[in-house]
């Protein structure tokens, strides 16, 4: 596993800075001897979701905790059929949701909703929260997470944002099925009552050269998938041409500019990349020569 590295980046959006809003995104990554983990979460924001910045952090923590389960790799590796894979992944999804709800419930217990938080919510949400119903909605967030091991990689998602996988032939794909319920500002959420059924996933035995996961603040900057792929292609070229720390630093330094010129939203990127492959086969990622600033929509 030493040839794969895991990274995560989150920056506050330009519009959030302008309007005095907190960052709603949260991301984590982890490198263990037998696995690499990365996750990005995007809290919904808005008056009814007044604790979604905490919700995104709890979602990232819940995902990471579940991915660290010592038995997880053997359980998923032993799944011989697609049906077995689906059943075990569905159980994993339920565990993530349950852990997120535990973290939310503990936070509510320690920090009850205040009048300053409830004053701006809709009448419908206020009635619900004041009667103790669906209080986790205040923490609503999306989630995209990836785990990569020696034998497989798994991607899980609820809500918007994009997971982009790059094969060792240089092909860019989005292996997690898209949810048509996610459109414009509407998205599914880990706080939904039927969240377990709304999760999508991909399970692959062939390891990629890299996997990128990005909150919708990233993909909303680009006019189509090919422009998004060019952005990640240039990121891979950075890994090929410099050391890991420099590549990540360059990306983090650029994201505020991307937000300002593009979506204005918070931005999170998770990366799991075979850095050895990127440096040994850099020409695989040289399809585009366009600069970042030419890739953002007006």
Stretches with model-predicted labels:
Residues 77-164, 199-205:
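Catalytic core of PPM/PP2C metal-dependent serine/threonine phosphatase domains
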Residues 31-34, 148-152, 159, 166-170, ...:
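Short acidic-glycine loop/turn motifs at beta-strand connectors
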Residues 6-21, 114-136, 140-141, 165-206, ...:
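PP2C/PPM family metal-dependent serine/threonine protein phosphatase catalytic domain
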Residues 38-41, 156-158, 212-214:
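Short hydrophobic beta-strand that contains or immediately precedes a catalytic carboxylate
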Residues 185-298:
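C-terminal catalytic subdomain
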Residues 61-103, 107-108, 232-252, 256:
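Helix-loop-helix
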Residues 159-165, 169-181, 225-237, 286:
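Short, surface-exposed, charged loop/turn segments at secondary-structure junctions
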Residues 1-68, 161, 192-202, 263-270:
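N-terminal entry segment of metal-dependent catalytic domains or homologous docking segments
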